[in-house]
């Protein structure tokens, strides 16, 4: 799953994760979880922040609709700390990985 830091200031950064629907049906509900050692996620755009901090859970926002088969969706988050590659990625209950 592609990840990149899009903004960085002293003690604060914003990251972007691109979610791709690799199934043959629209994806109307999803959950992304990951750990972020050395950072505290505080806000999210493009999803609902269920659990903040260094152990993060983000769910789809019902108002954004579904992701079509083969389609992508961007989730952006703001965090305090030092940016790095998040770990322990799980999407829809399955292990995934982040790529820079």
Give names to the regions the model predicted.
Residues 19-23:
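Asparagine-centered strand-capping/turn motif at beta-strand->loop junctions
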Residues 52-80:
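Structured beta-strand segments within beta-sheet-rich domains
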Residues 1-5:
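Boundary/junction segments of secreted and surface-exposed precursor proteins
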Residues 7-16, 28-29, 73:
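Short, solvent-exposed loop/turn segments enriched in Ser/Thr/Gly
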């Amino acid at each position: 799953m592609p990840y990149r830091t899009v903004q960085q200031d002293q003690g604060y950064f914003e990251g972007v994760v691109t979610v791709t629907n690799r199934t043959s049906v629209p994806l109307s509900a999803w959950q992304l979880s990951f750990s972020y050692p050395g950072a505290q996620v505080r806000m999210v755009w493009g999803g609902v922040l269920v659990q903040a901090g260094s152990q993060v859970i983000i769910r789809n926002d019902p108002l954004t609709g579904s992701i079509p088969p083969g389609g992508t969706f961007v989730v952006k988050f703001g965090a305090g700390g030092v940016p790095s590659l998040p770990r322990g990625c799980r999407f829809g209950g399955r292990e995934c990985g982040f790529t820079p």
